[in-house]
A protein has these predicted regions:
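Bacterial N-terminal signal peptides that target proteins for export
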Residues: 4-22, 29-30
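Intrinsically disordered, low-complexity terminal tails/loops enriched in metal-binding residues
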Residues: 14, 24-188
Length: 188
């Protein structure tokens, strides 16, 4: 009877050990999958940083009623967007990331050819769509998505006071922060 109880205990311990090992392997496998998905998105987000810089410079110029640097920065976005690799992104937002490079490249190309402040602002609306989507997904630090109900359009800007690129000095603070680090804004 003692031998049987010892064998039963030994078998139970082996089963418990096997379950524990399988659970740990499943957890490690899951974490490896998550890490791979995050590294693809992280790599994409790193590639987006110079694009974000050029985009923010365009927004600053337009909010100051200026075209200075707009064409140069738009051309830079065209080149940088062509080199983006969204194929490595997997997980929840993979389908959204997939379209960002082509949408950025097309909108930036149009903006680089825009003549005059009003046409540049209209083209900037199209460029802002994939940028706002990306910022909403990746949440880069100190960057907000702002919406202007007067323009019926969003844009991305550095965290701080709203500076409307679609109306400039006429309605510089028209907009509401709807995403990013802050959710407070000034709305008309």
């Amino acid at each position: 009877v003692m031998k049987n109880q010892t064998k039963i205990r030994s078998a139970k311990l082996q089963i418990l050990f096997a379950v524990l090992i399988l659970t740990l392997l499943a957890a490690v496998g899951w974490n490896v999958t998550v890490a791979r998905a995050e590294s693809g998105a992280e790599r994409f987000d790193q590639q987006m940083q110079p694009i974000l810089g050029s985009y923010l410079r365009i927004g600053d110029a337009l909010s100051s009623d200026s075209l200075t640097g707009v064409r140069k920065n738009a051309e830079s976005i065209v080149k940088l967007a062509a080199a983006l690799d969204s194929a490595s992104v997997s997980g929840e937002h993979a389908a959204h990331y997939k379209n960002v490079p082509a949408n950025l490249e097309k909108a930036a190309r149009t903006l680089s050819k825009a003549e005059g402040l009003e046409k540049a602002r209209e083209s900037f609306k199209k460029l802002s769509q994939p940028m706002a989507m990306w910022v909403s997904m990746s949440k880069p630090k100190d960057v907000d998505v702002v919406y202007c109900s007067m323009s019926k359009a969003s844009w991305v800007q550095k965290h701080g006071k709203v500076r409307n690129p679609y109306h400039g000095a006429k309605m510089l603070e028209c907009g509401e922060i709807v995403g990013g680090d802050s959710h407070q804004g000034h709305e008309h």
